[in-house]
């Protein structure tokens, strides 16, 4: 695999990527996940996104780069993971997924895990 695109910042390390993909999988099971750049944009505009995950190997990466700007406007943490194929598997679909949004639900059983990941992503952004 080639070096990740320098525009893909912040990029999660392998341990954090694994934790993020686990939470993505659990949120998919609880119907708290939106898949794709367009749906991620919609969750940001509606104010229901907890955090945004994007794939660093997206080609061309510019099709995603409106999301970090929108995230900063809305004060939502965002992170890049190395592989769109792995993100697609975690989202429970057979195709690659370039962006996903974990949505908020106060009654969720994985609320604490979501907040834990959110804190780790926020420390990457500093």
Curated annotation (Swiss-Prot):
Known partners and oligomeric status: Component of the U3 snoRNP particle. Binds to the C'/D and B/C motifs in U3 snoRNA. Component of the 25S U4/U6.U5 tri-snRNP particle, a subcomplex of the spliceosome. Binds to the 5' stem-loop of U4 snRNA.
GO biological process: box C/D sno(s)RNA 3'-end processing; filamentous growth of a unicellular organism; maturation of SSU-rRNA; maturation of SSU-rRNA from tricistronic rRNA transcript (SSU-rRNA, 5.8S rRNA, LSU-rRNA); mRNA splicing, via spliceosome; snoRNA guided rRNA 2'-O-methylation
Function as written in the Swiss-Prot or TrEMBL entry: Common component of the spliceosome and rRNA processing machinery. In association with the spliceosomal U4/U6.U5 tri-snRNP particle, required for splicing of pre-mRNA. In association with box C/D snoRNPs, required for processing of pre-ribosomal RNA (rRNA) and site-specific 2'-O-methylation of substrate RNAs. Essential for the accumulation and stability of U4 snRNA, U6 snRNA, and box C/D snoRNAs.
Domain of life of the organism encoding this protein: Eukaryota
Keyword check for Transmembrane helix: no
UniProt KW keywords: mRNA processing, mRNA splicing, Nucleus, Ribonucleoprotein, Ribosome biogenesis, RNA-binding, rRNA processing, Spliceosome
Coiled coil: none
InterPro entries linked: eL8/uL1-like, H/ACA_rnp_Nhp2-like, Ribosomal_eL30-like_sf, Ribosomal_eL8-like_CS, Ribosomal_eL8/eL30/eS12/Gad45, Ribosomal_eL8/Nhp2
Pfam families: Ribosomal_L7Ae (PF01248)
Gene giving rise to this polypeptide: SNU13
Subcellular location: Nucleus, Nucleolus
The protein, known as: 13 kDa ribonucleoprotein-associated protein
Molecular function per GO: RNA binding; U3 snoRNA binding; U4 snRNA binding
GO CC field: box C/D methylation guide snoRNP complex; fungal biofilm matrix; nucleolus; precatalytic spliceosome; small-subunit processome; U4/U6 x U5 tri-snRNP complex
Entry similarity comment: Belongs to the eukaryotic ribosomal protein eL8 family.
UniProt keyword Ribonucleoprotein present: yes
